[in-house]
Amino acid sequence: QKGFIGGEFKLGIIPTVMPTLLPMFLKTFIKRYPKIKLKIEELNTEEIIQRIKDGHLDAAIAATPLKNEHIKERVLFYEPFVGYIPNNHRLTSKKTLEISDLDINDMLLLEDGHCFRDGVLNLCKANKTSDQNEFQLESGSFEMLVKLTNEGMGMTLLPYLHTLDLKEKEQEQLHYFSEPSPAREVSLIYHKSELKIQIIDALHNIISGIIRGAIAFQNVQIISPIAT
């Protein structure tokens, strides 16, 4: 019976997923499973993999595929990358973006250590040119990337869920990619030994059910979150 699932459960979440996804499911989960003592920690992917292997984390929400033999992955959703472009930009007039439009030299990036940054770099690899004179900036938050884009310092790419929190005026600066849209795969990951699988199942079911109403994108191409 659902009501009898209980005990401590340690969940890791990567920083680029935590602020948008956690508020969507946390209240529902706690209400439905009051006996589970959920401990949540924001961790990068490397830390998550290590802690799952060491048994210090029961599960995590991360960008996949990670191709790690110790870890099982269950897809929660596919989250498209969305262009956020200032008004004075060469791509401002484009209704939909192509991957070939991207230029790493005018792209504002998250700082090193974020798998979303590695995904963007993998996306830009195809047409990579390097020009040392260009202004380059890396930041720890999407909020800062949005502010700098608003100042005309370049363009950036945002995960779709993050775009839902933008102000109405800022929404006008979003440019979607033509299908199949580049996207990241976000999964619930856990050790292959499947300890606490009942709680993992419960978590997967609740998040999948909630996210279905927010993200309906199916025609996507998955961009690897691993630095190449």
Question: Where does each model-flagged region fall?
Answer:
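Short, well-ordered beta-strand segments
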Residues: 8-12, 60, 84, 108, ...
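Hydrophobic/proline-rich hinge and linker segments of small-molecule sensing/allosteric domains
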Residues: 72-112, 182-196, 206-212
